[in-house]
């Protein structure tokens, strides 16, 4: 026999309101890298541009190449004490602050100093990706119905986007405090350590909130029940290649992240060379970040009325229309800010929808293959994210090159050709990506709410 702990049914009030505080702190922590890693390498550590390029490229390529592996490992190894996924919310996060801090510490100008930064960057990402994937996997574990999964995904997205607002007020003052204590060069190392500690604490909060939601089975000698949550490499491959909705969703997710990263990266060029008022960027970021939070929070209400799939499709198409309209009125800065802010509101909705859609593909995969590949499929969400980051530089650089951009150009003398090239990256290409996302879901993602509920009932009937 096996000693099997009964799992809770229905979401607790804590999960409905506070699931996502770990994601909020996680994003706060990773934003130190997003906003200050290059600045640390060039201005504080004062490495040459060639060295900086080597460090960032090496770390990002390794990170991207490993992005698929975390879910596969979680699905394939023996479950830990507190469950296959929930256990990882407490096992590794405490190591992250110590590894992450060294990514922003300069030991010397030689190869040892460079090696320490690269190793710290790669190691910290490996360590935090396991709990990150486990955390997302818990949406499918705790969310027994499409409504529950939509609720969890929406709350998580709202908290994650709220971190952008917090970061804009916290990061610089915190860095200034540590600069006065340990010096300017390593100030971001201290910020990374502190925010890494906050992340570990908040992941522990998630660990506590999910208590009782994941089945924990202690096998004995007479146990004959096969663990359906443990998968072989063949099982994992089948869960992907025999899962057309998952492939369609990953394409749509990549397009979504392309929109986010490209628009974020090119915004400074728009306000500098088209609006000719770089100071507007700060206000634009505050407005769009707040609207992202609002969109994320409201997504669950839309999903209840339209279904998560339909909400995502309609949102992607609406965002594309808004971006195209912004391109036609690119010289009207106020209108562009309004339209781009509306698009970011839509991004908040789409960001909240996609984890719930991944959870639906997990149900489909188990129905199709007989194996529960929750960790593997949840971990695959990392792939569009990492590829999206890589496409950002390619798209922005290509558009600027076609527009004959030069850093020596006076913003006041920016040509129409340059302005249109910037708008191509800011509006047109993201709009095209969003149309692809909508079509991918419309054609390839045929999982309706009714079908998912039917598959769940059939899985339960199998025992």
Write out the residue ranges for each language-model feature.
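Membrane-embedded alpha-helical bundles of multi-pass transporters/translocases
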Residues: 2-463
